[in-house]
Design a protein with these regions (language model features):
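Long, hydrophobic N-terminal alpha-helical segment
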Residues: 1-42
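A structural feature that tracks compact, well-ordered secondary-structure segments
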Residues: 11-15, 23, 54-61, 70, ...
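A short, acidic/glycine-rich surface segment
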Residues: 33-36, 65-70
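Short solvent-exposed loop/turn micro-motifs enriched in small/polar/acidic residues
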Residues: 40-42, 64, 111-112
């Protein structure tokens, strides 16, 4: 329907990022994240590991009341988000709206050189679904 080509990344919400990193790095066979960053607008600190072509992200809140903070307070730590690559986020949003999917974003958000948008989690079995440019 929207041309999903692959999973881009999966996000795990954690309270204590350094502790979670130590735990997961051992399992993943990694000495350190492939990428670390802070996204001030989303109020998250992220450690990303690549497993094949898929990003596996551990993320913690950098601000009280952020989406990650609220998620952990409501549900505890765990899988928060699955992101799918699509050829064109703008047209995917239009198609999803036409097919009665509940969107958080009516217009794409932009980070670095990518457009992305979120679907509401409740109708998606409690999972926050992200669509992001990059699928060809």
């Amino acid at each position: 329907m929207i041309g999903i080509t692959q999973i881009d990344h999966i996000c795990i919400a954690v309270r204590d990022l350094p502790k979670a990193m130590g735990h997961w790095e051992k399992l993943l066979g990694k000495e350190k994240p492939d990428l670390e960053y802070i996204h001030d607008e989303e109020a998250i600190q992220v450690a990303r590991y690549f497993v094949g072509e898929v990003g596996f992200e551990l993320m913690c809140s950098t601000r009280e009341g952020s989406d990650v903070d609220r998620f952990i307070k409501k549900r505890g730590e765990g899988v928060m988000l699955v992101s799918f690559k699509v050829p064109d986020t703008v047209s995917a949003i239009e198609t999803l709206n036409e097919n009665n999917y509940e969107m958080i974003d009516k217009e794409p958000r932009i980070w670095e050189d990518s457009k992305f948008a979120f679907l509401k989690p409740r109708p998606m079995n409690g999972v926050l679904v992200e669509i992001i440019d990059g699928g060809n």
